[in-house]
């Protein structure tokens, strides 16, 4: 091979169609490291044989399992993975409200990359008006993912 890694940027049905084709075209996952994006942090993909050993950025499910279980208990519906974003936003708004920050204080807070917030999906901070996260590298194995860094 002329490469050691391959980034699979698909999701959903697309990912489940593409990943199994790679070994068919002689891209051996035992030789080439399959990498995904954070969107493959979904149990659906953890059982796909061609994705065993694949790595992706994320945080362990244990960090958000209480929220997922509480949501299911209250609403009797499955927790949408993207719901951690507004959940963290509400936590940040509550922090600002309880500290009685003025507008200038909020701007200063959000422009300080040294100020990190503990969110459901890991620590996050603002840098140049963008959200940055400190993520782990997770590896898929036998229906689960685990931290390798």
What are these regions, as identified by a protein language model?
Residues 1-149:
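Extracytosolic ligand-binding ectodomains
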């Amino acid at each position: 091979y002329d490469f050691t890694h391959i980034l699979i940027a698909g999701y959903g049905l697309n990912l489940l169609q593409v990943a199994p084709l790679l070994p068919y075209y002689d891209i051996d996952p035992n030789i080439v490291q399959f990498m995904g994006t954070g969107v493959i942090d979904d149990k659906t993909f953890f059982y796909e044989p061609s994705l065993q050993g694949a790595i992706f950025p994320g945080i362990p499910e244990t960090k958000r399992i209480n929220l997922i279980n509480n949501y299911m208990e209250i609403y009797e519906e499955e927790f949408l993975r993207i719901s951690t974003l507004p959940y963290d936003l509400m936590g940040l708004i509550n922090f600002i409200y309880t500290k009685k920050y003025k507008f200038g204080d909020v701007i200063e807070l959000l422009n300080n990359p040294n100020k990190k917030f503990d969110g459901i999906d890991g620590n996050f901070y603002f840098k140049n008006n963008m959200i940055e996260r400190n993520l782990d590298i997770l590896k898929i194995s036998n229906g689960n993912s685990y931290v390798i860094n």
